[in-house]
Structure formats: C-alpha cells, structure tokens
C-alpha cells in the first residue's frame, strides 16, 4: 500500500485495551481501535488515556488504525 492511500485523523485516546491497543475518539466523533506504530514502540513513546494523537487509517477498514504521533 502506498503512502497516498492513507487517511490521517486527529483524536483522543479514551481507553487502554489489552495487547497494546487503544480506543480512540476521532475529531469527527467516530470511535476506532488503534495500535501504536512500530517506530513509536521502538522509541518507547508512551500513550495514555487523554492523550491527543494522530491516527493513520486505510480506506478499506475504517474501524482500525495506527497511532503515528502523540502531540505534546
């Protein structure tokens, strides 16, 4: 999948789930399940409930996403 096909949204982490998954409420009031990107895991960036984040989603499945950035 190329980079152009990815949709990016901002959201807020509402709940921490098992297996490093998170429930995220997007700006447009949709709720999705997201996991952290590998680069965030490698650099040990912590994501907690209430954090504002950037999520990448594929247009094929709009219920799952990947957390790519945590705002400061």
UniProtKB/Swiss-Prot annotation:
It is found in: Cytoplasm. One of the essential components for the initiation of protein synthesis. Stabilizes the binding of IF-2 and IF-3 on the 30S subunit to which N-formylmethionyl-tRNA(fMet) subsequently binds. Helps modulate mRNA selection, yielding the 30S pre-initiation complex (PIC). Upon addition of the 50S ribosomal subunit IF-1, IF-2 and IF-3 are released leaving the mature 70S translation initiation complex. One of its GO terms (molecular function) is rRNA binding. It holds the Pfam family eIF-1a. Keywords: Cytoplasm, Initiation factor, Protein biosynthesis, RNA-binding, rRNA-binding. This is Translation initiation factor IF-1. It comes from the Bacteria. The keyword Cell cycle does not apply. Belongs to the IF-1 family. Residues 1-72 form the S1-like domain. PANTHER family: TRANSLATION INITIATION FACTOR IF-1, CHLOROPLASTIC. Component of the 30S ribosomal translation pre-initiation complex which assembles on the 30S ribosome in the order IF-2 and IF-3, IF-1 and N-formylmethionyl-tRNA(fMet); mRNA recruitment can occur at any time during PIC assembly. Its main location: cytoplasm. One of its GO terms (cellular component) is cytosol.
